[in-house]
Amino acid sequence: MNKIYLIILALLSSFSLYAQGTDPQAKKILDGVNGKMKSFKGVTANFTITSVSSKGRNNGNRTGKVSIKGQKYLLKQDKVEIICDGQTIWNFDGAKTITVSSVEESGSTLSPQNLLSNFYDKDFTYRLIGTKGNFHEIEMKPTDARKNFQRVNVFVDKNSSLITKARILDKSNNTVEFTLSGINTNAALDDKLFTFNKARFPKDVEILD
């Protein structure tokens, strides 16, 4: 589930992945999202995640909040917390373990930093599925077959040029859909928000790096 959280951050952030075999219409839309996000100093949003098994069983909803400022981000969902100061990532599992990794170490994963830079021009192929109502739907498939998901369908609001929903299909044909709401693109976020403070976590927490 933590990988899904990272995708949420990535899609909400200044979009920059890189793709091969691109659809010009889809690229124009994604470029618009990228440019729009880069103009914001701080972004906050609420999210709802709904997961459905390959057999169609609804596994329930999860809700949380994300805050993003440039390369820094904070995600909270119940007791789970992921903090990044732009160089280091602290991932608290909500119990007694914090896993520490560097942004560089996450270079081969679907992390916000990778998605923050132009993922739709190298790491994905993508095409515009269609436009319905106020939304463009774009299908994105990873060029690396080792990724643990088959595709991501993103829904871009035509009026705001923001991604407000995404549907992820994994290798086991399970689906995870998340919806963003209450998006604030003019959030004043203090850098302290993205600073790791061990005192905020359980005294017996184990830190793995």
What are these regions (language model features)?
Residues 63-110, 176:
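An acidic-aromatic
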Residues 15-57, 71, 205-209:
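N-terminal leader/targeting segments and the immediate start of mature chains
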Residues 7-16:
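Bacterial N-terminal signal peptides
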Residues 1-4:
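Positively charged n-region of N-terminal signal peptides that target proteins for export
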